[in-house]
Amino acid sequence: MAQEQTKRGGGGDDDDVTDLGGPAGQERREKLAEDTDDLLDEIDDVLEENAEDFVRAYVQKGGQ
């Protein structure tokens, strides 16, 4: 029997940009860093307000 190998590429639309060394690349890195910081701040806010519920839900889903 023959086995086939499939190469899968990763995903987003504009993640395939290879030249991130120029000014556009720097701008993109800064935007991604800002978005990441905003998301982490939102997670921190949720945990501060609702840590017990978060932990309970996490444990119920099989987390340790």
Curated annotation (Swiss-Prot):
Keywords: Coiled coil, Isopeptide bond, Ubl conjugation pathway. Residues 21-58 are annotated as: ARC ATPase binding. The keyword Transport does not apply. The keyword Zinc does not apply. GO terms for biological process: modification-dependent protein catabolic process; proteasomal protein catabolic process; protein pupylation. Residues 1-11 have a biased composition (Basic and acidic residues). One of its GO terms (molecular function) is protein tag activity. Is modified by deamidation of its C-terminal glutamine to glutamate by the deamidase Dop, a prerequisite to the subsequent pupylation process. Pathway: Protein degradation; proteasomal Pup-dependent pathway. There is a cross-link at residue 64 (Isoglutamyl lysine isopeptide (Gln-Lys) (interchain with K-? in acceptor proteins)). Residues 24-52 form a coiled coil. Residues 1-36 are annotated as: Disordered. The modification Deamidated glutamine is found at residue 64. The N-terminal unstructured half of Pup provides a signal required to initiate unfolding and degradation by the proteasome but is not needed for pupylation, while the C-terminal helical half of Pup interacts with ARC to target proteins to the proteasome. Protein modifier that is covalently attached to lysine residues of substrate proteins, thereby targeting them for proteasomal degradation. The tagging system is termed pupylation. NCBIfam families: pupylate_cterm. Strongly interacts with the proteasome-associated ATPase ARC through a hydrophobic interface; the interacting region of Pup lies in its C-terminal half. There is one Pup binding site per ARC hexamer ring. Belongs to the prokaryotic ubiquitin-like protein family. This is Prokaryotic ubiquitin-like protein Pup. The gene is pup.
